[in-house]
């Protein structure tokens, strides 16, 4: 029952469950962005084949399709495990919001996944069996299916961070969807999708350029390598610029609905107007928010007024810090944001009202519940400081993402310059650097997810359900055991994928 949300569950069980889900998500995200990125490269290459009818482009397409196929299979396998964990480890969450959260996942499984499965078969086995136009359409539709799949999953994730389009039913103890469009087309969902997909294109583009540079180092497949660098670097440069634009909008959206996350990203303990954006700083790893004493990162280099501009679109806009959010603050429009302690009191009122209504069916409890429902999750918070996520992790992960992203813009621009204006094969240092960019691109992408997920702690659903109340009633030992089983399984899968990819890359394209 949601009014008695597993208050006896040990913190170790919660930590192991979080670790297991994080492990699965991190491994899953090693495969997904490469799938989305390679889909674009395959589509461009086959479009060139369709328009020119040159066998060369067919060989290019089929080569990248082989690598796509291996990665696609691994992504599906880890994704299935990830969805099952909602039911096994997070059953309270599944019960509480399953009517809302389950809808986009169901659409993803029924529509997008079946779309992918249908057209991927034509893409791999339809060469010379269907018309060139239909095969080209199948290739693009495979990529579109994967992208639509990502859309619905990201809609579900965005709803957890910015819950809209739902209403709580005290009789069923569940949230019920009131507006599908509000859920599917929320500004948070749209921005999360565009930023995530463009970052995936960056991963695919980096992979293509790096593999092509390896061929140039080995003095093999010169024509394929140069053509692929042109495609990959072109896609990558466009994607990095788009990712920068959508990233800027992400910061703005986070500032509106998750101010604590933004404060953690900036290690901003005490906010104000005209806040600067920290470029470089040293954050104390164990520093805790202090109500009395201002705490600033050491060796701080900042851009004046930039944080206020990103968060409010005005150079002198007010940005709350960690302590401001804990103690309560006044918005620019004059409305007051309650302190965390006030929200905790109101959350407890909502829980008591719900419990009383469930036991007595007293109708006078429903207005109390409705009035305080927006703070329902705070009723399970024992200490206001639980609302502060890990500031060092958020701070450094954000800068790692932005720093590598900026480096990738230069990398793709230089790739295009060298392949079009110079003899790129002569620049051995660049060819080696390109290979190193693969892990860096992945680190940037994973760092973005770390900021998004660590930054919203302790919430499973922002303001409505903390992690401690979302968990299943399972034993710590069971979760710990499956954690190590999954660790071994996923590591094996990753090792197998890398070995197959390396083998296929060394083998090279197959010429008819």
Q: Which positions does each model-derived feature cover?
A:
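Polytopic transmembrane helical bundles with strong interfacial aromatic enrichment
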Residues: 2-512
């Amino acid at each position: 029952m949601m009014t008695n949300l597993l208050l006896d569950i040990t913190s170790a069980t919660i930590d192991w469950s979080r670790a297991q889900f994080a492990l699965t998500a991190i491994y899953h995200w090693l495969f997904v962005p490469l799938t989305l990125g390679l889909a674009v490269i395959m589509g461009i290459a086959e479009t060139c084949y369709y328009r020119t009818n040159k066998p060369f482009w067919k060989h290019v397409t089929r080569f990248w399709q082989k690598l796509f196929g291996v990665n696609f299979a691994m992504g599906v396998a880890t994704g299935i495990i990830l969805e099952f964990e909602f039911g096994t480890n997070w059953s309270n969450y599944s019960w509480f919001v399953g009517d809302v959260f389950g809808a986009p996942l169901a659409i993803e499984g029924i529509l997008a996944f079946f779309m992918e499965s249908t057209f991927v078969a034509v893409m791999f086995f339809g060469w010379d069996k269907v018309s060139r136009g239909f095969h080209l359409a199948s290739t693009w539709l495979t990529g579109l299916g994967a992208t639509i799949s990502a859309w619905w999953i990201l809609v579900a994730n965005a709803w957890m961070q910015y819950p809209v389009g739902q209403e709580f039913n005290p009789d069923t103890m569940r949230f019920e969807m009131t507006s599908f469009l509000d859920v599917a087309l929320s500004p948070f969902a749209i921005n999360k999708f565009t930023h995530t997909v463009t970052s995936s294109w960056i991963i695919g583009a980096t992979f293509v350029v790096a593999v092509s540079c390896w061929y140039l180092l080995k003095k093999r497949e010169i024509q394929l390598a140069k053509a692929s660098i042109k495609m990959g670097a072109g896609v990558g440069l466009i994607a990095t610029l788009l990712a920068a634009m959508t990233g800027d909008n992400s910061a703005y959206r986070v500032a509106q609905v998750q101010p604590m996350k933004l404060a953690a990203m900036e290690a901003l303990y005490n906010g104000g107007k005209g806040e600067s954006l920290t470029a470089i700083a040293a954050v104390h790893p164990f520093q805790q928010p202090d109500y009395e004493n201002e705490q600033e990162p050491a060796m701080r280099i900042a851009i004046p007024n930039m944080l206020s501009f990103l968060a409010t679109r005005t150079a002198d806009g007010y940005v709350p810090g960690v302590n401001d959010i804990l103690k309560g603050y006044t918005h620019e429009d004059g409305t007051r944001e309650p302190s965390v302690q006030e929200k905790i009191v109101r959350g407890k009122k909502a829980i008591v009202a719900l419990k009383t209504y469930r036991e007595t069916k007293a109708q006078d409890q429903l207005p109390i519940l409705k009035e305080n429902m927006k703070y329902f999750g705070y009723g399970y918070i024992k200490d206001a400081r639980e609302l502060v996520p890990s500031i060092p992790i958020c701070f450094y992960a954000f800068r790692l993402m932005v720093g590598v992203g900026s480096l990738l813009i230069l990398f793709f621009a230089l790739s295009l310059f060298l392949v079009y204006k110079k003899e790129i094969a002569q620049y051995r240092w660049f060819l080696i650097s390109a290979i190193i960019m693969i892990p860096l691109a992945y680190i940037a992408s994973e760092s973005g997810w770390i900021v998004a997920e660590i930054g919203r702690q302790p919430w499973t659903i922002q303001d409505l359900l903390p992690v401690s109340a979302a968990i299943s009633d399972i034993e710590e030992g069971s979760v710990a055991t499956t954690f190590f089983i999954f660790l071994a399984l996923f590591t094996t899968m990753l090792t197998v994928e890398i070995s197959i990819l390396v083998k296929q890359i060394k083998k090279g394209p197959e010429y008819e």
